[in-house]
Every structure is written in structure tokens, then in C-alpha cells.
A protein has these predicted regions:
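N-terminal small-domain helix-loop-helix segment of the aminotransferase-like
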Residues: 2-82, 87, 349, 358
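PLP-dependent enzyme catalytic core of the Aspartate aminotransferase-like
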Residues: 307-308, 317-358
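PLP-dependent aminotransferase class I/II
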Residues: 200-284
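Conserved PLP-anchoring active-site segment centered on the Schiff-base-forming lysine
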Residues: 91-112
């Protein structure tokens, strides 16, 4: 009888709660205001031939490479960062080898590593979600072939110091080291300039968050040109759809829109953290477009916020996140709605007298 591989049969499930998302969607770290108007205008003028033809990725890759200041052979557009993670697993992981992650973190690192037949080594974050650089290095072995680090991290919003990331890349020359910068725009610091020093270093970016193109599924993976040549062998030449390729240059061309949105999100993040601190709710200072907070009765909190038209994400099942919710930030008008509903919910549930932040 036909049966999937053992690695596939034992994979954990990842079922994001997409159904019934009615309300202000602050649960998936999306751009809550939407993409640039220039993208919408481009969509209106798509020609039938563009949809009838196989997509051509290279001209758009050249534009993205120019914007990032890298050479085109160092860059690959992907079907979201998810595909970038999958491609690295397929390129570098053999069954029985090891992939290293820091937990809590993005669930798909573990799933793609396990699908490749690898053993996943989970290194717990330090107290207050401090990045455990020493502990990561201590878990590097001759079997280590992939290390995946979200920076800023999801769901905590915390960051890894560049010196730790450099030390990890230096300590694991036979492993691919992925620094996933999905929330780069809200943080502003990158490891992109380090790629020439470390040929085993890869940087991923997405256009789902700040750029508001989550529905088009487009991201980018950057690394050493020789290594990227191997990654391209695993990738389909038609992995990014024609609509995404047509719209991305317009999104990139409207940096004023991105800058305004990012500035408002950062402002909203400060406002949320101030309200949480005033209510003595523990939270993790964030460098992303979300904040993780420990509210205790997370499921009740999520339901009460939903009743007030605000969707937030229960992260209680993540390592060390018992009783926690993750709240996405948007522009000022969305922060106003969020904070009003938040205070009402805290008062109603009687959880505004929790422990101090630290």
C-alpha cells in the first residue's frame, strides 16, 4: 500500500486560524492598511497575455537586486519566505542531519526541516526572550547543516545581536545560516552586508508585511552567488506568479508609502506598549509590527477582543508563551480602535492587575 515517507507521517500540523476572520485583523502580522495605490493601479491594467504566459522572473529580480545593492546572481525571488525556507532545507539537509532553531519561533522552520528528514535541535531563548547566542553555538555539531533565525523573531519581536549572528555563521562553516528578516522594515538593521564575509549566510526578506502583498506570495532570498546557484537548481523557474511579478516593481517604487506606514506602525507599537505597562501586563519589547503580551486567560481574551471587532492571535501553545497573545500593529486609526477595545477587555476580564513587565 502506498504510504508517505516516515518524515511526512510524523510532521506536526500547522493550521493557521484563517476561517471566520471578521473584524480588524491584528492576528497575522499583515499590513492592516493594504498595499500602495500604485499596486492597485497596476492590477487594473494587467493584459490578458500576461496571465496566459509563463512568468519571467529575471527582469524583476534585477530590479530587486538593484534596490538591495546586491548582484542579481546572489538573489532569488521566492513564493513568500516560506518557499525560501523550504528551498534551503531541500538544498542542504540530508535525512538524519540536524537543523537548529531558537524557540519560540516561526513554526515552518521546524516543519520544513522535519519534512527533509532532519533532526530539529530546539534551543530555548533566554530570560526575557534574550537571544541565546552561546547556547546556539554550543549546539552546533558536525551534523548541523541548517540554522534558521528569525530576526526580529516571531512571536516575541526580540532581536539577535549582529555579533552573535556573525559568531554563529563563523562557528558553523558547513551549515547554511538563514537570517529571516521578514520584519526588517520595522527594525531597520540587517545582516545583508555580511554576506561577502560569510559564504554560508543567507538573508530572507518578504513583501508580505510592510509592503502589504501577503496575498501575492512573494519574497526574496539572498546569499553567496555560488550557493544560490545550488538553491536555484531546486527551485522551479515559474515559482513566482505573473501577477506578483507585475506588481512588485510598483510596490518598490512607492517608498514614501512604505515609510509612512512603517512610521505609523512604530508609533502604534509605542502606544500599545505604554498601555500594557500602565496596566501592569507583561510584554516583550518588540522591534517588529506586533507585540507579545501575557494576559493569562488567552482564549477568553481573544474571544472578548473578537466581540469588540478586533482579532488577535493566541500564542499559548508556543514554547514559553503560556497565556500569551500576539497583537499586530497598524496605522494610527487602527491603533485607536485596538487600544479602546484592549482597555475594555482588560477591565472586563479583571486582568489589568498582573505582574510588572519585568
Amino acid at each position: 500500500m502506498l504510504s508517505p515517507r516516515k518524515a511526512v507521517r510524523t510532521l506536526p500540523s500547522y493550521h493557521p486560524p484563517l476561517a471566520g476572520r471578521h473584524g480588524l485583523r491584528l492576528d497575522f502580522n499583515e499590513n492592516t492598511a493594504g498595499c500602495s495605490p500604485r499596486v492597485l493601479e497596476r492590477l487594473r491594467h494587467l493584459e490578458p497575455e500576461q496571465l496566459a504566459s509563463y512568468p519571467e522572473r529575471e527582469p524583476v529580480e534585477a530590479k530587486v537586486a538593484a534596490m538591495l545593492g546586491v548582484a542579481a546572481p546572489e538573489l532569488l525571488l521566492t513564493n513568500g519566505v516560506d518557499e525560501a525556507i523550504h528551498l534551503l532545507c531541500e538544498t542542504y539537509l540530508e535525512p538524519g542531519e540536524e537543523g537548529v532553531i531558537v524557540v519560540p519561533t516561526y513554526s515552518m522552520y521546524r516543519i520544513y526541516m522535519m519534512a527533509a528528514g532532519a533532526q530539529v535541535i530546539s534551543v530555548p531563548a533566554g530570560q526575557d526572550s534574550i537571544f541565546p547566542g552561546d547556547n546556539v553555538c554550543a549546539h552546533i555539531s558536525p551534523r548541523t547543516r541548517l540554522i534558521a533565525i528569525a530576526n526580529p523573531n516571531n512571536p516575541t519581536g526580540s532581536v539577535a545581536p549582529p555579533k552573535d549572528l556573525r559568531r554563529i555563521a563563523r562557528s558553523a562553516p558547513d551549515a547554511a545560516v538563514l537570517v529571516d528578516e521578514a520584519y526588517f522594515e520595522f527594525y531597520g538593521q540587517s545582516m545583508l552586508a555580511e554576506r561577502e564575509q560569510f559564504p554560508n549566510l543567507f538573508v530572507a526578506r518578504t513583501f508580505s508585511k510592510a509592503y502589504g502583498l501577503a496575498g501575492l506570495r512573494i519574497g526574496v532570498l539572498i546569499g553567496d552567488a555560488n550557493q544560490m546557484r545550488a538553491v536555484r537548481h531546486v527551485s522551479s523557474p515559474y515559482n513566482v506568479n505573473a501577477v506578483a511579478l507585475a506588481c512588485l516593481p510598483e510596490a518598490l517604487g512607492d517608498q514614501a508609502y512604505i515609510e509612512q506606514y512603517v512610521n505609523e506602525v512604530r508609533e502604534s507599537r509605542v502606544r500599545l506598549e505604554q498601555v500594557l505597562a500602565a496596566n501592569r501586563i507583561q510584554f516583550w519589547p518588540s522591534e517588529a509590527n506586533f507585540v507579545l503580551a501575557r494576559v493569562g486567560a488567552a482564549s477568553s481574551f481573544v474571544e472578548q477582543m473578537r466581540r469588540r471587532g478586533i482579532l488577535v492571535r493566541d500564542r499559548s501553545s508556543d514554547h514559553g508563551c503560556e497565556g500569551c497573545v500576539r497583537i499586530t500593529l497598524g496605522p494610527r486609526v487602527h491603533a485607536d480602535r485596538l487600544l479602546a477595545a484592549l482597555q475594555e477587555t482588560l477591565d472586563e476580564l479583571g486582568i489589568a492587575q498582573g505582574a510588572p513587565r519585568r
